[in-house]
Amino acid sequence: KKIGIVLLILISLIGTLLGCGKQDVNKDLESIEASEIKQIEHTGTTGGKDGNYSYSFSDDEVIEFINLLNQVKLGDEVDENKALSSGAVSYYTIHLATDETLTISPGKYFKVADRYYEFDNYDELWDEFIVFNSIK
C-alpha cells in the first residue's frame, strides 16, 4: 500500500513539474508589453527560389503584434520533427529593451525559442497572424 501511495505522489509531482513549463511560456507571452520592445524583425522564406525576406515592424505594428501575441494560448510541447514542415516559414525576433531576444515562429505548432508547442487557439488567431506574415 505504501508503494502505491509513493507512486501516486511521484506521478502527481512529475505531472505538476511538466505542466509548469507550459504555464511559464504562456505567462511569458501574455506578459510581454510593447513598451519593453526595441524592435521586432520579421524574417522568413516563401519556400521558393530567392524567397527570403526581412522586415522591421513600425511602432504601430509592434503594438498590434504584441497585442496579438498576448492572446496566444500554448498547449503541450511537441517534438521538433513533428512540428517542422516544408514550405513558407516566418520568424519574429523580438528585441527587448534589456538586450535579450526572443525568436518565435507561429504556425499549427508555435515555436518559442528552441521549443515547439501546440497552438491551442490557432483557429481563433491564425488569420491575424497571416496579416503579419504578409508584411514584407
Predicted regions and their residues:
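Sec-dependent bacterial lipoprotein signal peptides
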Residues: 1-18
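Function-determining sites in protein domains
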Residues: 20-136
